[in-house]
């Protein structure tokens, strides 16, 4: 819905969120910056005014964009999520849960631009028409190598804080081709979020492995092989859905396109008919042994 080179001009929609108690980059009315710079401001700095301005630019109004957010969340299978603003500022009707945030993060990882922004530790927004350059550095300790909480394999994450929600963190780690998402919420400080996330990642990497089943990777407990899985097949139109389970727990699926039976060739049909006709017209001679 936008290009990195698009130029965004800050309006009242954005600058209204520039307050002392709201995370921001102090954007000014009439200030311009590229959409790419806006992405990094929203991600690294959690700049609420930038989130609102992106929403207005893409959706025409922030309200329209929020409706797009809700529709997307529903499409992703989120069942306990509802947005009323683009930034996540507190509202009793603005909520989500750990499972839904993990689904949203998983969807984001499939987008190359999202992933590139997610992996960024430091970024500098160049000087604009109304501001000097703004250097930004990640607020995710698990991503920052200089942090004592750095986690090997962490590729990025998103922090969040409000008095009502306390500290929340959705973070991603990859090792040996396996990717895990950890979401922790309502911790009293970010250090606890990081410790909980580290414990979750350690458990996942130490307890599970990836195996190949019918050409597709599936995550199973270490030591489990494809032979240990059970399969259930379901017909979906012209495709067969093979669902695999380990001790009743779903581990993955493979979609197989059904191959239609080949249609008989007319020439072969004519040949077969001729042969059958010849057999029917050929007399059978009984042979009697002579004494």
Regions found by a protein language model. Give the residues of each.
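Domain-terminus/edge residues, biased toward the C-terminal soluble/receptor-binding domains
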Residues: 78-82, 90-291
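Active-site-adjacent loops and short helices of periplasmic peptidoglycan-processing enzymes
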Residues: 1-99, 103-112
